[in-house]
Amino acid sequence: MNLFGKVVSFSRGKLNNDTQRVTAWQNEAVEYTSAFVTNIHNKIANEITKVEFNHVKYKKSDVGSDTLISMAGSDLDEVLNWSPKGERNSMDFWRKVIKKLLRAPYVDLYAVFDDNTGELLDLLFADDKKEYKPEELVRLTSPFYINEDTSILDNALASIQTKLEQGKLRGLLKINAFLDIDNTQEYREKALTTIKNMQEGSSYNGLTPVDNKTEIVELKKDYSVLNKDEIDLIKSELLTGYFMNENILLGTASQEQQIYFYNSTIIPLLIQLEKELTYKLISTNRRRVVKGNLYYERIIVDNQLFKFATLKELIDLYHENINGPIFTQNQLLVKMGEQPIEGGDVYIANLNAVAVKNLSDLQGSRKDVTSTDETNNQ
């Protein structure tokens, strides 16, 4: 008779998408790991909320690069950066979008347009109970979701469930009941009722009353727990799944670790936002580079890689920018975290830096050096 199998049953818990904890798993190791994943999600979501969505217009050029014109203050700028979009504020909305994206295969957003002007009025989470046309939805797919049955967290926790459950039996309880092989359900109900009463009775001071026919036999064994190496392994698997170093969470990451995390985790999400928002929120005629169009529009996101630069690197950039200017004074101020100033939209260069269209124009440009002298020096 398989008494143990009839009396006790084990079941795998389902992942709670809000708390990132598995139902019925109350072990400290599981809760610790779940909180660890929640911190990872918060870090990624908070990084995304720092960026700004820039609605821009490019002017086509027959020679050289197309020039960019900012459309700050447009309907897209207002909705993407400022309006609450059905939540407390704009940052709260984008934080929820990213958190959903970290635990689901995709996130659908519904864009609300003005029927008369075609302007974007709002951007909301799609209603699961309503059917939409594909072109009506901004669909963001998750690069971290594994499949429909599990997530990175659930997959990692599954590997430790067996060990914890196998070591869960701590003792035997002899109760005042007769075991009828043909009626194990009644026996099981009596056993569970007895255990429940004992737990409720011991909730006050740890003591519980039992009758004179009830006996508790504690098993002399080491209860199953996770050691440090196993915890570190789980943390490593989780961090690797998000291309993250633990120092990122601790605030002690090196510049290389920060840039790797940003390039591997944050920028792929930003690129997807750029492409999907541009494709679904800007009309085809305004978006495509077609004959007859002088301008075309995009939504771009600043990757903010300059925020990882050290003060020395920013100073070096300032000096190099004088020799070969690529940023105006105001652009440099913004990259250093300062505000633009009036009259700062100029390039500053020393006298050794000149503007040329072709490298051959540099030959003989200095008054004190002739073309022949330069050739001889070479």
UniProtKB/Swiss-Prot annotation:
UniProt keyword annotation of Cell inner membrane present: no
Domain of life: Viruses
Source taxonomy: Viruses, Duplodnaviria, Heunggongvirae, Uroviricota, Caudoviricetes
Record's keyword annotation contains Nucleotidyltransferase: no
Swiss-Prot/TrEMBL GO biological process terms: symbiont genome ejection through host cell envelope, long flexible tail mechanism
Protein purpose: Forms the portal vertex of the capsid. This portal plays critical roles in head assembly, genome packaging, neck/tail attachment, and genome ejection. The portal protein multimerizes as a single ring-shaped homododecamer arranged around a central channel. Binds to the terminase subunits to form the packaging machine. Necessary to ensure correct procapsid size during capsid assembly. Once the capsid is packaged with the DNA, the terminase complex is substituted by the connector proteins gp15.
One of the record's GO cellular component terms: viral capsid
Keywords assigned by UniProt, alphabetized: Capsid protein, Viral capsid assembly, Viral genome ejection through host cell envelope, Viral genome packaging, Viral long flexible tail ejection system, Viral penetration into host cytoplasm, Viral release from host cell, Virion, Virus entry into host cell
Similarity comment: Belongs to the skunalikevirus portal protein family.
Chief location bin: virion
Subunit (UniProt): Homododecamer.
The species this protein was found in: Lactococcus phage SK1 (Lactococcus lactis bacteriophage SK1)
Subcellular location, record wording: Virion
Name under which the protein is recorded: Probable portal protein
